[in-house]
């Protein structure tokens, strides 16, 4: 690993917008280092001088699973091995579509969605744990979950399955880490219904195309969506505390 000093370092997927972007900005404002991953660029780069070089952006498509080990290696090479007090991995990126009955979804669509929303977080976590096991720093993985991981919905089979998988994966890894010399903390955090691009995608579907489109529109029109910034603030509190991974942590929990 590198020689750059710093207190806390966070690897965050999906920092180009939504919760990932807000979380990165709040952590940077606290003086932390952030390594953002997204398929495209990031607005954070435009204000990189404001962050005193503490934001690094990596453009990468998480659907490309075979390169994730090297991705984590490249990022960890920039993080100090001795000076870092905390290293975190926030698996935030996810793909909502396809929003159709499963018999109307192609193999390519199913594969891409599951790769980004489930397989990538698993591989990122595996590589992160393996490559930081020699460190004494506190380590934590946060997996962004969803109510869809617990409640089945028509035309959302792929997304619901990916989030259910994230929840179970989190609990399994927590059990694996129990009793380790420097265990990695891991939690699944359900942010609730948030005003993000995923919500906009769901609202943009016709009722014929997506049966729940009306419900998503109603939630938006009645002002029930939470802002990404509010969710990011609450998530930072969960990052700081030592949490129980035996259940999904909901944003409404005190």
Predicted regions and their residues:
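Conserved mid-core segment of classical short-chain dehydrogenase/reductases
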Residues: 85, 95-111, 130, 155
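Active-site helix of classical SDR
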Residues: 125, 162
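Catalytic Tyr-X3-Lys loop
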Residues: 103-122, 166
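C-terminal helical subdomain
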Residues: 184, 188-191, 196, 204-254
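Residue(s) in the substrate-gating loop at a strand-loop-helix junction
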Residues: 146
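Conserved glycine-rich cofactor-binding loop
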Residues: 16-17
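Conserved glycine-rich Rossmann-like NAD(P)H-binding loop of the short-chain dehydrogenase/reductase
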Residues: 30-46
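Rossmann-fold cofactor-recognition segment
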Residues: 50-66
